[in-house]
Amino acid sequence: MLKLFSAFRKNKIWDFNGGIHPPEMKTQSNGTPLRQVPLAQRFVIPLKQHIGAEGELCVSVGDKVLRGQPLTRGRGKMLPVHAPTSGTVTAIAPHSTAHPSALAELSVIIDADGEDCWIPRDGWADYRTRSREELIERIHQFGVAGLGGAGFPTGVKLQGGGDKIETLIINAAECEPYITADDRLMQDCAAQVVEGIRILAHILQPREILIGIEDNKPQAISMLRAVLADSNDISLRVIPTKYPSGGAKQLTYILTGKQVPHGGRSSDIGVLMQNVGTAYAVKRAVIDGEPITERVVTLTGEAIARPGNVWARLGTPVRHLLNDAGFCPSADQMVIMGGPLMGFTLPWLDVPVVKITNCLLAPSANELGEPQEEQSCIRCSACADACPADLLPQQLYWFSKGQQHDKATTHNIADCIECGACAWVCPSNIPLVQYFRQEKAEIAAIRQEEKRAAEAKARFEARQARLEREKAARLERHKSAAVQPAAKDKDAIAAALARVKEKQAQATQPIVIKAGERPDNSAIIAAREARKAQARAKQAELQQTNDAATVADPRKTAVEAAIARAKARKLEQQQANAEPEEQVDPRKAAVEAAIARAKARKLEQQQSNAEPEEQVDPRKAAVEAAIARAKARKLEQQQANAEPEEQVDPRKAAVEAAIARAKARKLEQQQTNAEPEEQVDPRKAAVAAAIARAQAKKAAQQKVVNED
């Protein structure tokens, strides 16, 4: 009984709410085998054919490429694209792609050479000996993405599943009307599809593998059963035909009874789903060593003379495929990429086939019917009854139309699979899916802007924090630099502390004198002498500093000389105004005269050693010479008027006369060496010379008188 219940449970299927049963229209194209299409002359390969960022270009204009050669590098979620045939890269520029608004995206344009040469292919027939990481990396680098319509990178999806996948589901439902690409692929390539499923199972190691297929594909079901006859690891589940049973969440619930939570993924409940075409592409990438360069595309519609399924190279213009199938356009002809419910109308026919292109529908006017005018919503709730995601389409419609993004998000607009069932049953002909697509795009743009604002705020706060840290570090460095003395100050402080400690030690150490011995004061005397020597050295250093400052400043020297002359003049006046009874001592006068002469000589030397740029003024020199001669004359008069008993020493007089003559001669030389532009007056020089000769003659006469 338990075995019977287990078998019943194993084959049980569930049914989801909502859904519709539109005309299938599949017999137009599923009756003929897959066929090849002649190569186009030019291929346009968009760099972004998947969910995620585009890869990095690795070719340049003018490069020769082979079929399967990478055109971009894939890192992370960036999926590479490959050359669909051999030829020459003629341009790398924006081009319209498979998008409702025909947005231009960066594309590589290749002119085919007609040879269709492959790159060297290295297949892994022994893939079971390869590690999981190696297989995932090969699948990713060979450009395999979800071919069921989403275009999510397969390698990233397998990597994200990890070890938590318990059920691997292969989606073979293909529920949308007109599309028969997967049906025909399973009829013609069932063995290769099953081999690709086994590769996926080897990577994921799930507990069960389920193939879900609708009962409107009897030939494909027969082929799969024939291939799976001897295997028990893969279960084929035939489900009732109902749109949209091919949705990921809907098929997961049909086969397992598990519901994917709102905002979650199927991997959250241990389920991973892949499309039939993706499994076939995995087999070719791993075992055959062929990157994805082509896929099966359904060409159908009453405007096509030879409908069917073809192997279309990626990058082939849509116009080329339709012309090969006998396209007979009518007035206002419409071409839809995808199915009638989830597809979109192409703005023009030069867009290329990409990885997510599964159908090209060219309906006639009879198939489309008359266009219906959009009317107001009557709140009939037919859309809510048909919604397979258990949403409220009429409420989402009002929120989308009123730009109420928060309420639309609260009502789980992100869970809308855009199946078009609500628009199919709407009696008011409201294109609900278009409103929902626009609303989701606006919400995504708002979130992207909020993300950028948050990142900018984080960068600003990080910058402010960094500036505060740097400021605090600078203040700390300044504080530590102020607290710690310089190296010289440290040495001086250490020396002073050492001296203080030495003095304290000497003061505290008792002096012991033995009986009969004299105290030894040599240490004290030596210390005293050292202090005296230190004081003398310091005084000499200060004197040298003052002398250097005095010599360096000629103006200061001149001021000091003027002060000395004023002092001498004042002294002479005091001597002249002295009481007559107090006669001037000739010796004292001679000493003062000698001191005055020494001061004058010292000042002259300082002036001569001054900076060369400040030359001696000849007029000042002449004035000083005249003053010196006047002082000498005055001293001689004082000596002559001295007491007769105290006669002047003739030798001193001769010496003084010689000194006076030398000073006069020196002053004449200074005047001669003065600036050439300021010439000495010859009359003044003659007068000075005459005065000097008179002084010398007078001194000689005085000498003779004294001898007599």
From Swiss-Prot:
Taxonomic classification: Bacteria, Pseudomonadati, Pseudomonadota, Gammaproteobacteria, Enterobacterales
EC number(s) from the headed UniProt entry: 7.-.-.-
Residue positions binding [4Fe-4S] cluster 1: C377, C380, C383, C426
Binding-site residues, [4Fe-4S] cluster 2: C387, C416, C419, C422
Domain 4Fe-4S ferredoxin-type: 369-397, 407-436
Keyword Iron-sulfur found: yes
Stated name of the protein: Ion-translocating oxidoreductase complex subunit C
GO CC, alphabetical: plasma membrane
Cofactor requirement: [4Fe-4S] cluster
